Regions:
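An N-terminal-biased, well-structured beta-alpha scaffold segment characteristic
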Residues: 1-80, 184, 204
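Short beta->alpha connector loops at strand-helix junctions that form conserved
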Residues: 13-16, 60-61, 77-88, 163, ...
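Rossmann-like adenosine-cofactor binding region
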Residues: 29, 42-46, 160, 164-257
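Phosphate-coordination loops involved in phosphoryl transfer and adenosine-cofactor binding
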Residues: 54, 132-135, 205, 214
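C-terminal helix-to-coil terminal segments
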Residues: 73, 80-92, 251-303
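Glycine-rich Rossmann-fold phosphate-binding loop(s) that bind the pyrophosphate
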Residues: 141-142
Length: 303
């Protein structure tokens, strides 16, 4: 807040809870800049409510599917995001989910808390040995994916990836393949692609059917990339071994079918929730606002 105050503009500060649509339109009216998070849906109507003085919308996130970027561009409003500063925190959480799902950590915790009598056995809650030659497949190969790949290589995993810019070859121990090959060959499939019209429900029933029955799915990208109904069906039928989700198609609502699904680890969109990381995201968002309001190019413009 101090950094924003230094700009010499009046501030309107929201509360901890996401604003309603009417509150958002009220608060953004007459603003020259808006710092928002993924809970705020900035569409053409909200932009119109802001008025002609709005110059920049700084999204405190890498993904920006909550903002109508085309409508903003039409109105001459710069949209920015916060890439880079959250790569390691998100990669850490992604790998934590890989281990939690594949080694059945949450299942074990729930089992003990249930109070059931138990006796240790050599085949109790067997999971995937990720460091015994398991293959990690990464859908989408941006900065966060590269950070996940580095962690996977430290666990001696074989890493496959898909990329819009290349479909074959190797780079830093990562082999690039097409999506079908990746799905069929991977022991863990990690979704790290942005949500676009082309990637919505990229992981559908057909994609899940291509995966090994022993494989796990992890999504820390955007909820809409995975068809949640198809995932529930696959888990319930045992067509894949398990999954872990940090993001959901209709946040903050989580489909009750997901809550009831077996072998599924869920976290509430907290992959970047390291204290230092969140501070850095906020600072970068404010730096983008400061740049635009002082006539300089935005540091992280979204196009």
């Amino acid at each position: 807040m101090d950094r924003l105050a230094e700009l010499g503009r009046p501030l309107r500060v929201g509360g901890e809870n996401p604003p309603s649509r009417s509150e958002l339109e009220r608060d953004i009216a007459g603003a020259c800049a808006a710092v928002v998070t993924i809970t705020e849906r900035i569409d053409a109507d909200v932009l119109a409510a802001a008025g002609d003085g709005l110059q920049v919308i700084a999204n405190v996130a890498v993904g920006f599917d909550n903002i109508d970027v085309a409508a903003a561009a039409t109105m001459g409003v710069t949209v920015t995001n916060t890439p880079g500063v959250l790569d390691n925190a998100t990669a850490d959480h992604t790998f934590a989910l890989i281990l939690a799902a594949s080694r059945r950590l949450v299942e074990g915790d729930r089992f003990l808390r249930s109070g059931q009598a138990w006796v240790w056995g050599p085949r109790m809650m067997l999971g995937l040995d990720v460091s015994a030659g398991a293959t990690l497949g990464i859908l989408g190969y941006g900065r966060i994916a590269r950070a996940v790949a580095r962690r996977a290589r430290a666990f001696d995993m074989r890493v496959l990836a898909t990329s819009r810019s290349r479909t074959s070859g190797d780079e830093d121990g990562v082999r690039f393949v097409d999506a079908d090959t990746l799905l069929a060959a991977s022991d863990v499939v990690c979704v790290l692609t942005p949500l676009t019209p082309e990637t919505r429900h990229l992981i559908d029933a057909a994609a899940l059917a291509r995966m090994k029955p022993t494989a796990y799915l992890v999504n820390t990208a955007r909820g809409g990339v995975v068809d949640e109904s198809a995932l529930v069906d696959a888990l319930t039928a045992g067509r894949i071994s398990g999954a872990a989700l940090d993001v959901f198609d209709n946040e903050p609502h989580v489909d009750p079918a997901l809550l009831a699904a077996p072998n599924l680890v869920l976290t509430p969109h907290i992959a970047s929730a390291g204290a230092a990381t969140r501070d850095a995201m906020g600072v970068l968002a404010v730096d983008n606002v400061a740049a635009v309001l002082t006539g300089r190019p935005a540091l992280n413009p979204v196009r």
